[in-house]
């Protein structure tokens, strides 16, 4: 099979859909791989690294002309126009973008959105969301620590003691749990909130305090169970109580990291404008 790996053209995108290690395995299985020149440069992987494992370096047209195209993000209209009818596209294609799906269908392309893979043991190797969320949670803490004008851990000196930074993490999925672990390793005092009571043990096992918002109705308890490891939209009554709890914790926090996400929907607004205006000077929101 001819496999193509084009350069990602979305603004700010630095990832590449295949590393030299992956390409080496594909070529070892008898496939032919064409990589667009410069596709791996922003990931610190030069063309020579791909050539060393047997890949062919070509232009965009050569990469998109393959039978199987590997992409990080969904292709735009110009990129779709370069693909062959009947070819296969694999990547994070945003399955909730109906317009993009319609364009791919009209082009006769078979598309597999990896973020739609079920979160099961059998499909674990396809779980790109968890791997990327893990990185996002780690990086979010580093970004917050970089912009925070003081220190993360408690520092004791002859001149006095500086208290540890207080970090509030909203959402305790893969990204949130990694953010908790990273913030704790940097010495911060961490609190975390999530709609799912089941994650309380996971939060506390990492050394953070769980911001508990009690569930008062059957509807709230049902929504809090989630589906496939993901949260569901919560009733307005619970959201109001949660907003008050977040407001109180945010005013005491130095860094707030928001990771909450609902698949296929706009991320919930967990920090209100009034809360932000009252937060401590120098505090950071990621």
Predicted feature residues:
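Residue-level detector of alpha-helix initiation sites
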Residues: 74, 135, 173-174
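An N-terminal-biased, well-structured beta-alpha scaffold segment characteristic
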Residues: 2-103, 107
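Glycine/serine-rich phosphate-binding loop and adjoining beta1-alpha1 elements at the start
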Residues: 2, 8, 77-166
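A structured beta-alpha segment of the ubiquitous adenosine-cofactor-binding alpha/beta core
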Residues: 54-64, 74-75, 221-256, 260-277
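Short, ordered loop/turn segments at secondary-structure junctions
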Residues: 8-10, 37-40, 74, 94-95, ...
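Glycine-centered, small-residue-biased loops immediately flanking beta-strands
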Residues: 283
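Glycine-rich phosphate/diphosphate-binding loop of Rossmann-like nucleotide-binding domains
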Residues: 6-45, 153-249
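Generic hydrophobic/aromatic pocket-lining and core-packing "Φ" positions
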Residues: 23, 47, 80, 101, ...
């Amino acid at each position: 099979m001819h496999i193509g790996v084009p350069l990602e053209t979305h603004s700010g995108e630095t990832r590449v859909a295949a590393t030299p290690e992956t390409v080496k395995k594909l070529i070892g299985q008898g496939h032919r791989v064409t990589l667009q020149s410069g596709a791996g440069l922003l990931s610190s992987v030069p063309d020579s690294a791909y050539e060393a494992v047997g890949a062919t370096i070509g232009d965009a047209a050569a990469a998109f002309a393959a039978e199987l195209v590997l992409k990080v993000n969904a292709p735009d209209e110009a990129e779709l126009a370069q693909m062959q009818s009947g070819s296969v596209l694999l990547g994070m294609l945003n399955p909730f973008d109906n317009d993009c799906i319609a364009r791919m269908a009209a082009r006769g392309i078979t598309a597999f959105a990896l973020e739609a893979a079920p979160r099961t043991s059998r499909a674990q190797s396809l779980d790109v969301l968890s791997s990327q969320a893990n990185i996002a949670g780690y990086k979010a803490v580093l970004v917050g620590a970089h912009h925070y004008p003081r220190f993360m851990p408690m520092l004791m000196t002859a001149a006095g003691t500086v208290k540890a930074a207080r970090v509030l993490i909203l959402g305790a999925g893969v990204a949130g749990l990694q953010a908790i672990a990273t913030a704790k390793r940097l010495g911060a005092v961490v609190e975390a909130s999530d709609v799912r009571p089941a994650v309380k043990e996971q939060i506390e096992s990492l050394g953070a305090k769980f911001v508990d918002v009690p569930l008062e109705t059957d509807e709230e308890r049902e929504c809090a169970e989630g589906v496939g490891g993901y949260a569901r939209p919560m009733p307005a009554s619970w959201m109001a109580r949660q907003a008050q709890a977040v407001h109180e914790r945010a005013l005491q926090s130095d860094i707030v990291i928001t990771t909450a996400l609902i698949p296929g929907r706009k991320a919930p607004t967990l920090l209100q404008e009034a809360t932000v205006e009252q937060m401590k000077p120098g505090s950071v929101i990621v």
